Curated annotation (Swiss-Prot):
Transmembrane segments: 72-92, 96-116, 144-164, 184-204, 245-265, 304-324, 349-369, 423-443, 455-475, 478-497, 501-520, 541-561, 603-623, 641-661, 679-699
Protein task: May be involved in the transport of nicotianamine-chelated metals.
Protein name: Probable metal-nicotianamine transporter YSL8
Gene: YSL8
Entry GO terms, CC: membrane
Residues with PTM Phosphoserine: S25
Amino acid sequence: MRKGGLTPDRDRQIEEHELQETGISPDIERLKRNINATPYQREEEEEDREEQEESVEGIFESREVPSWKKQLTIRAFVVSFALSILFSFIVMKLNLTTGIIPSLNVSAGLLGFFFVKTWTKMLHKSGLLKQPFTRQENTVIQTCVVASSGIAFSGGFGTYLFAMSHRIADQSGDVARGVKDPSLGWMIAFLFVVSFLGLFSVVPLRKIMIIDFKLPYPSGTATAHLINSFHTPQGAKLAKKQVRVLGKFFSFSFFWGFFQWFFTAGENCGFNSFPTFGLRAYQYKFYFDFSATYVGVGMICPYIINISLLLGGILSWGLMWPLIETRKGDWFPSNVDSSSMNGLQAYKVFIAVATILGDGLYNFCKVLIRTFSGLISQIRGKAGSRSSLAHKEDPPASPASPLTPRISYDDQRRTRFFLKDQIPSWFAVGGYVVISAVSTAILPHMFSQLRWYYIIVIYIFAPILAFCNAYGAGLTDWSLASTYGKLAIFTIGAWAGSDHGGLLAGLAACGVMMNIVSTASDLTQDFKTGYLTLSSPRAMFVSQVIGTAMGCLVSPCVFWLFYKAFDDLGLPNSEYPAPFATVYRSMAKLGVEGVSSLPRDCLMLCYVFFGVAILINLIKDCLGNRWGRFVPLPMAMAIPFFLGPYFAIDMCVGSFILFVWERLDAPKAEAFATAVASGLICGDGIWTLPSSVLAIAGVKPPICMKFLSAATNHRVDKFLQGSS
């Protein structure tokens, strides 16, 4: 007898064989049954036939599912470590340039499949292959890589952690309120202390989230379908073609970055300072900077995000900032530096902050309402079904009854394997308590402003917020980790107060909260992927833990490389301005200081944009999907407010390329667009490693390509002729 029972196809074959043995034609018997059947039974049989054709697990039924220990292979973690370094560089670069980070799940799954498939093929030819490459192992790699590179975001290297530094404090003009400059030792220790709690907080709820509530987790589901498709014969062929395309554009992007480097010998030199629309437009950051990374990001991000970014850039740098600049000497002092928080920079930062907070608050409330209404519906539904069974005097409904929900073969098999390897609740609760105790003891020594009782309060509420974030992400595919972090900034910062280091306490609390809720939603997303690929929950948990540990080591080292290689890291007009670091410090400053330090009419404009962000979201939801998808996103519109629209132009170029490609050849665009985009992002992202090494070694580019107006060029020529 085979394991796992009979597949629908096998059941049908046995039934037809038995009918033939009795001399009855299966087709005639099926026709008789169809005539005598009720409409509902005919519908059931039709659904059964469709299920037999569409069953995913039916395809893999003959393949043995490895035990959870065999899913965790050495080769999987070697490949994961290599890919985590690659993706950490990519995420770090995006984090320190614009803060816009697209989903890299597809790239991680595709590259993981390619590397291990190549490895196993070589071993197979040499006769040393002991274990074939399975979709479960592919899922382990995907989970580990995403967990590791996720630390590059939740670790705060472009937000709360870098916001503590002297470099960002100088721009905000509040050095006296406390600084803590980056150091490799304390950053690694901090991440190890705070990054694992979220994993333990949601482990006991995995069955409720995945099986009982059947939350969709769109990203996790899409990743699982991708991995399942890789391991079918047709999917493997397509994956090879996709990897080939990715490799071509990776090479192009890498060598394009290398070529551009030769022309960047000075400030504002090179192709990334090309005045595409003229020098006047360039002054207000309207130009195409030839960034392969953001062209690729534009191909991945939805059209509405790219359009929203461009609209935000036009509204701010094309209209608002030139108008406010004319009020110099009236609304703010005329003698302040352009980067001073007492001048125009304050309007750029705080209006963006107000818009982000308005958008975040609206979506926070919306997701919470959906979360609690969904929970109430689930609880009522279960209570109703139990009471109806308890009081029902009639015999149970037949399998054909519409009262009994049908469970597909795929769901039966997936549920059986998902519940097979349990993670004990005592282990999860005990782990949370132990790590909380260690963290509460260590963190006050790292941040003297962060008192032990602040940390205990955070850890009491964190599991509730982690559950809310994980449930909300399951419904909407939207993690609100940064919003919960901002909530911690304001609450802990205000509690500590300005005179007791509230600014640093708020930023540190943000890091604690953000890491907990972010890893919690990531793990439940991975549980969904594991459920759909028959990967063991234990394997998913161990992979997430190992990936998180990798991230706690790799991400600080990558950031440290950037920090040491680029002296202007974090400055407004540099290659890596780290815009959200300024935003987070400004939020912390607001939390402890209030709004009294803002320039004239800045507060009024903040109120207006806060309200407009909520109103736009309300209009978007009221219009529904048909028309609401054309309404811009306030969060995306706010990012260019202090950064400029140049990267939005890059992303719109990516959108335009994708749009034209879809019109010319939609099937190929659907199959290869993500591979092209991933190649562009990965190649340019990995170029930052050699460029950082060259900068640390003191190797300078040989040429400065700079653009001047005719009048300035004439003066320069005259000066050079005079000096000669």
